[in-house]
Every structure is written in C-alpha cells, then in structure tokens.
C-alpha cells in the first residue's frame, strides 16, 4: 500500500543504472530514484538518469547540496592529510538518502556497486566510515574556511543503533 518499495541511489553510471533496471524489471519493485547533486555531475550522467527514468517510467527525487559548502569541506579534507578525501561527498549522499527514507517511511535503500572496480584491497589505514559526523566536523573546524549551514550530516550511531533498533 506504499507508493515506493525502496529508494535507489542513482549516479547515472552503469552500476546504479543496471541495479535500477533489475529492481524494476526482474524484481517488479516500485523504486523511488534518488540522486544527490554535490556539484560534480557530468552531462553524460544527467542524460543517463533522464533516459533511465523515461524508459522505466520512474519518479526522481534530487537533493542539491550547497556547492560552496561541499567545496570548502573537500578542500578541508585535502588540507587535513587524511587518505579518505572523498568522505564529504559520500557523507552527503548517505545522509540525505537515509534521512529521506526515514522521514518518508521507506524501509529499504538499494545502492549499486561493482566489486571489480570499487573493492580493491586498500590498506586498513585508508578505511573509514563516511558516516562519522564528528570527524567530518573536526576536520572542517580545523581546515575549513566557511561555516557549514546547510550541509547534510549523519552519524554512525544513527545508522548503526537508531535505525536498526529504535526506529518505529
């Protein structure tokens, strides 16, 4: 009786596009397509999302992140010297998608990935939860130039404790 069975995070790339196709055609799901624009969209990705939506007749929700804040955070992470410099963008993706799902009572989030290109064995020192709001804010406080007013945040506790055990 819900409008959507799940949310699918879509970038416009092959992995999330293929996942969307399989979810709709093979598993007969009713996904809401969720896209986060953090300022790095290519025209090809935007065109791919449009074609996917048209072909599969799906709805799209796009969250646009404040580019100046994304830029400032990314520069702060570069200046900090940590190896996981892509955290600001990943953090925004997961924060917005999980919060949207939570507040719209959508219980499942699907994301596309590719083991052959995204799961190269990195040194353990490089591994870090992108959902660590405290580290994100600490790095920004030390190396950022602007105040974060609109940047979406989330925390490990919200993901690992609240959502699985306390969400009603």
Tell where the protein language model's regions lie, with residue ranges.
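Short glycine/serine/threonine-rich phosphate/pyrophosphate-binding segments
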Residues: 14-19, 92
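Nucleotide-activated chemistry modules centered on ATP-dependent adenylation/adenylyltransferase
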Residues: 1-5, 22-168
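Short, glycine-rich nucleotide/cofactor-binding loops
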Residues: 7-15
